[in-house]
Amino acid sequence: MGKVLLELHSVPWNEEGLSDNARLYSFLEFVSPKIEELKYRKLLLEKLQTHIREVVLDAELQVYGSMYIGTTLSISDVDVSLKSPRVGELEKRRVTMVLRKYLDADADFHSSARVPRINLVDVSGIGVDLTFGNDKACRTAELQKAYNEEHPIFGRLLMLLKHWLFERDLENVHHGGIASCALSYMLIGWLEMRFHKKGIDSEVQPIRALLQKFFYFWGVEWTYELFVLRPLTGQIVPKLQKGWLNEVQPNLLSIEDPIDRNNDIGKQSFQISMIKAAFVASANELLSDKTWFSTFAITEDEMFLCKQFENVINTKRSLVEGYDSDTESDELQAGG
């Protein structure tokens, strides 16, 4: 299991003399979207709203997820909800048809999902997850953005951990992996338990050490069979008390949703045994001064995505330059 990893040598984080923090932050900068890509994502949202308004005239979109929180990676999807007005099944299907016409002929409408959604992929390779009236996800994003503003180390760690999951193909909750929301709360709960409740400043800790301790905690120390995590307060609640013990698979991850305390965010991660093994392996790897950075790598998938995005940008740039040249030529002829 896992994606194809690339062994790159001429990269900034392999330079000699870098501290551990500098290497990790250099890697993080590399896997984060550049200014041009961030602008493109905003334009993509504008296009999305324009097309949706062909069906829903006064449609208002609300961004949530990593783009709202400030933890976007180049591999991240654009998460957006049709905030208002509320629309019925017919309008959702008409929106799907419009998006198939303009953005992605293979746009997929999941009408039976807990939160109905349309998934599509832009020509740039950037994925879009459009949901309808997803108030809970938007409130979650607001909560996590506030936490990130108070504790910036949270965002940096979260981005590295999201990439770590992506490398190992463990980020897809539909395949039993860990969703971004669950990962975020695992990190918040751990930071609260181990640092903030004890009055310890997590911001001054070496980031390599934080990653190692996080992996060790969730790979070795946490008793999945017995406990539920209450993330914002770093509390531990017995599964039996919540009525969340799954007798068929008692070791499932359980996280109480701060927005809806009756919702278990972690229960869909049915590959938790495999994920725990990966946590333990990385916890051990990060202890080695010689090989610790092999915990992170660039994947073939994201290099392909990067090239796909560059091709789109270069094509548009060529069209603009061609238009400018034609305009200048026409003006010269007119002047002559």
Curated annotation (Swiss-Prot):
<keyword id="KW-0159">Chromosome partition</keyword>
<dbReference type="InterPro" id="IPR002058">
    <property type="entry name" value="PAP_assoc"/>
</dbReference>
<dbReference type="GO" id="GO:0005634">
    <property type="term" value="C:nucleus"/>
</dbReference>
<keyword id="KW-0694">RNA-binding</keyword>
<dbReference type="GO" id="GO:0031048">
    <property type="term" value="P:regulatory ncRNA-mediated heterochromatin formation"/>
</dbReference>
<dbReference type="GO" id="GO:0007059">
    <property type="term" value="P:chromosome segregation"/>
</dbReference>
<feature type="modified residue" description="Phosphoserine">
    <location>
        <position position="329"/>
    </location>
</feature>
<keyword id="KW-0808">Transferase</keyword>
<dbReference type="GO" id="GO:0031379">
    <property type="term" value="C:RNA-directed RNA polymerase complex"/>
</dbReference>
<keyword id="KW-0547">Nucleotide-binding</keyword>
<dbReference type="Pfam" id="PF22600">
    <property type="entry name" value="MTPAP-like_central"/>
</dbReference>
<feature type="binding site">
    <location>
        <position position="77"/>
    </location>
    <ligand>
        <name>Mg(2+)</name>
    </ligand>
</feature>
<dbReference type="Pfam" id="PF03828">
    <property type="entry name" value="PAP_assoc"/>
</dbReference>
<dbReference type="GO" id="GO:0005829">
    <property type="term" value="C:cytosol"/>
</dbReference>
<dbReference type="GO" id="GO:0003723">
    <property type="term" value="F:RNA binding"/>
</dbReference>
<feature type="binding site">
    <location>
        <position position="79"/>
    </location>
    <ligand>
        <name>Mg(2+)</name>
    </ligand>
</feature>
<keyword id="KW-0479">Metal-binding</keyword>
<dbReference type="GO" id="GO:1990431">
    <property type="term" value="P:priRNA 3'-end processing"/>
</dbReference>
<protein>
    <recommendedName>
        <fullName>Poly(A) RNA polymerase cid12</fullName>
        <ecNumber>2.7.7.19</ecNumber>
    </recommendedName>
</protein>
<dbReference type="GO" id="GO:1990817">
    <property type="term" value="F:poly(A) RNA polymerase activity"/>
</dbReference>
<dbReference type="InterPro" id="IPR054708">
    <property type="entry name" value="MTPAP-like_central"/>
</dbReference>
<keyword id="KW-0464">Manganese</keyword>
<keyword id="KW-0597">Phosphoprotein</keyword>
<comment type="subunit">
    <text>Cid12, hrr1 and rdp1 interact forming the RNA-directed RNA polymerase complex (RDRC). The RDRC complex interacts with the RITS complex via interaction between ago1 and hrr1. Clr4 has a role in mediating this interaction.</text>
</comment>
<dbReference type="GO" id="GO:0140727">
    <property type="term" value="P:siRNA-mediated pericentric heterochromatin formation"/>
</dbReference>
<dbReference type="GO" id="GO:0031380">
    <property type="term" value="C:nuclear RNA-directed RNA polymerase complex"/>
</dbReference>
<keyword id="KW-0539">Nucleus</keyword>
<comment type="similarity">
    <text>Belongs to the DNA polymerase type-B-like family.</text>
</comment>
<keyword id="KW-0131">Cell cycle</keyword>
<feature type="modified residue" description="Phosphothreonine">
    <location>
        <position position="327"/>
    </location>
</feature>
<feature type="modified residue" description="Phosphoserine">
    <location>
        <position position="325"/>
    </location>
</feature>
<keyword id="KW-0943">RNA-mediated gene silencing</keyword>
<keyword id="KW-0067">ATP-binding</keyword>
<keyword id="KW-0460">Magnesium</keyword>
<keyword id="KW-0963">Cytoplasm</keyword>
<dbReference type="InterPro" id="IPR043519">
    <property type="entry name" value="NT_sf"/>
</dbReference>
<dbReference type="GO" id="GO:0005524">
    <property type="term" value="F:ATP binding"/>
</dbReference>
<dbReference type="GO" id="GO:0046872">
    <property type="term" value="F:metal ion binding"/>
</dbReference>
<comment type="function">
    <text>Has a role in the RNA interference (RNAi) pathway which is important for heterochromatin formation and accurate chromosome segregation. A member of the RNA-directed RNA polymerase complex (RDRC) which is involved in the generation of small interfering RNAs (siRNAs) and mediate their association with the RNA-induced transcriptional silencing (RITS) complex. RITS acts as a priming complex for dsRNA synthesis at the site of non-coding centromeric RNA.</text>
</comment>
<dbReference type="InterPro" id="IPR045862">
    <property type="entry name" value="Trf4-like"/>
</dbReference>
<feature type="domain" description="PAP-associated">
    <location>
        <begin position="209"/>
        <end position="263"/>
    </location>
</feature>
